[in-house]
Amino acid sequence: MNILITGAGLIGAHTARQAVDGGSKVVLFDLAPNREYLEKVVGKGRADVVAADMRDLPALISALDRFQVDTLVHTAGLIGKRVAENSYTGATNNILGTINALEAARLRKLRRVVYVSTFGVYDRAKISGSAVREGDAVGGHNLYTVTKLCSEHLVHSYTEQYGLDTIIIRPAGVFGRGHYVGGSTVGMIMRDLALAVVKGDPFTIDAKVYAPNEVVYAKDVASAINLACQVKNPKQRTYNAGSGVVTGPQDLARIVKELAPNIDVKVTGASAEDSVKSSPLDLSVSKAELGYAPRYALKEALRDYMEELWADQRN
C-alpha cells in the first residue's frame, strides 16, 4: 500500500513505523513535523514528509498525487483542552481537516480512509454494560469530543453518499514516546512518570488528574490502525482499540514500584481506592474482524517506553 498519514505526532509516527515495517510506502502530512522525533520513531529516511496544513485541500490532493497514495489515515488535529483554548482554530483544524481528508480521498478514488477518533465520544452516563461496545450511546461532552463525533458523522456520510470505503478507530487514552505539545492529559502524565523513573526522581500521581481510566500503548493503537488499513470486506465501520483494562492511580503506582522498586511514587487526592471505575472498551469485535489484540499490558508498555527513553538518554 501507499499510505498517507495526516498528523506526525504520537499515533501518526507509530502507525508510520509499523506500516513501513510491513512493506508499505508512507508519507506523513503535518503542519509542523518534528523531524528529529520522526527519525527516532520511524527511522531516518524511511518515510516521506510533507509540511502542509490539513485545511489546505489543494496541498493535500497534491501530496496524494505526488506519492500515488491509495490509502489515507487521518490522525491530524488538535486534542483535549487545546481545542477549547481556541475554539475556532480547534474546530476548523478538526472538522475542516476531516472534510478535506474525505473530499481528497473521494476525488482521488482512494481504496480506503481510516479515521482515528477517540473513546471520549461514548456517553458513559447512558452505558450500563460491563464493557463499552461500538454500538453504545455516543455524545459530545466538550469541544474536543464534539469535533471528533462530528467528524465521525462526516465519515459515515461520505460512505453512505459516495461509497467511500472508511473505517473509524476509537482508541482509549494513548501514551508512548511522543513530542507532547499539550492537550493529552494521560499522555503527558505517563511521559512525566516514565521520565522520572528513568532519571531516578520521585513522582507524585494526583488522583484528581489521573482518574480511573483505560490507557493503551501507542504501538498497540498503531497495530489497530494498520490492521484497519488491510482488512478486506469489514462487517462494520467502527472499532475500539484499547487495552481492555481500566487502571486507577493506585494501580499505576503499584506497577511503577514493581518496575523500579527504588523509586519513590506517591498518590495524592485518592478517593476510596478509586471506587468509581469506568467500564473498559469491549475489544471482541476488533479481535474477530480486524485481528486486533493488544500486545502490551500496562506494565510491559511502561517497561518498553522506559527502555526507549533510556536509549534516548544514552544517545
Residue ranges and their predicted role:
Residues 12-13:
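N-terminal Rossmann-fold NAD(P) dinucleotide-binding loop
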